[in-house]
C-alpha cells in the first residue's frame, strides 16, 4: 500500500491509498461487512454506492466460518466476491465488547465463544495469523480498546499493554512474510499525555498507517475532538490516519476537519434496517405516519437507486410491512449518502472550501459549525 497526499485545507487532507487491488480516494468511508457481507447487499450493489474499500471483522470470521473454510476459497476477497481492498479489524474491540465474558492477560485474551460457549484464546500472534489467511489489504494490530470512563492509571496500564501487543503483532506479521499494510492503533483514552506515549511507541515500531482507537465509546464529543486535535498533527504526515468506529455524518465532517483520512461504522447500514435514513437536511424516520402519503423522493438531491425510483410513501409502506426490500432500499440509500458526503468533502478540500462546506452542512440542519481548537483554526 502507498499513500499519496494530494492537497490540504487547514488540517484536512485529500489523498489516496494505492493498492494492487485498486485505488481508494481519501477521506474515505468503509462500509462494514462483519461476516463477509454488508448486510443485505451484494458486492456489486455496495460498489455502486461508491464504496472502494470494505471492513471485515476478524473476530467473527474466525469463529464462523473459520480459517480453514476461508482458505478453501483462497481468502476473504474470494469468499465474498469483493474485488477491491479490505481492511480487517484485529478483534480487540469485539473482545472489549464481551465484558465479563473475557479475561485479559499479558499473553492475550481468554473468553467464551459467544456462539457455543466453548473456551477460546486470542493473542496478537493469532490475530496476525487469522488476518494473513483472510488476505487483508490492511491488517490492524491486536490491542485492548480501553473502556470509557477509565481513570488515568487504568488507561496507562491498558495503553502500555497495547504497545507491547503492538510489538508482538509487528513481529508475527513480519514472520509470516505478509506484504500487505499493517496499521498501529493509538490508545490512551481521553488523556493527551498517554496518547503521546502511545503514538511515540508506535512510530518507533513502525507502521504503514495509524489508527486512533478508544474513541466513540461513550466519551463526550468535546473529548473526541480534543484528542483528535492533539494527536493528528503528530502522526507522520506520509501515513494515513484512521478513526475507528466513527460514525455519524457530523462525526465524519469533524474528523475530516481535524485531519482524519479513513472512517468505518455500522451506523448507515444498521440505521437503514431500522428505518432511520440520512438525507441532505438531516434525518428521515421513514416509519413515521407523516410519510404515509408522501409521494416525493426520499432525498431529491440523492442519485441512488432508491431515490431515483421510489417515493417516501412506498418506503414507509415497506417498513410498516417489515418487507426485506425495504431494508435493502434503505441500505442502498444510506450507503450512497455516506459516499456522497465523502466525495463532497474531498471536493471541498481540493477547492480550499472545506469551512464553507461545513457551514452549509450544519446550516441545513439548523446548527452552527462546532469550533476547532486554536491550533486547528490557525492552520
Swiss-Prot record:
Keywords recorded for this protein, A-Z: Glycosyltransferase, Metal-binding, Queuosine biosynthesis, Transferase, tRNA processing, Zinc
Residue numbers annotated as active site: 89 (proton acceptor), 264 (nucleophile)
SUPFAM superfamilies, alphabetized: tRNA-guanine transglycosylase (SSF51713)
MF-aspect GO terms: metal ion binding; tRNA-guanosine(34) queuine transglycosylase activity
Region (RNA binding): 245-251, 269-273
Oligomeric form and interacting partners: Homodimer. Within each dimer, one monomer is responsible for RNA recognition and catalysis, while the other monomer binds to the replacement base PreQ1.
Protein name per Swiss-Prot or TrEMBL: Queuine tRNA-ribosyltransferase
Lineage, top ranks: Bacteria, Pseudomonadati, Pseudomonadota, Gammaproteobacteria, Enterobacterales
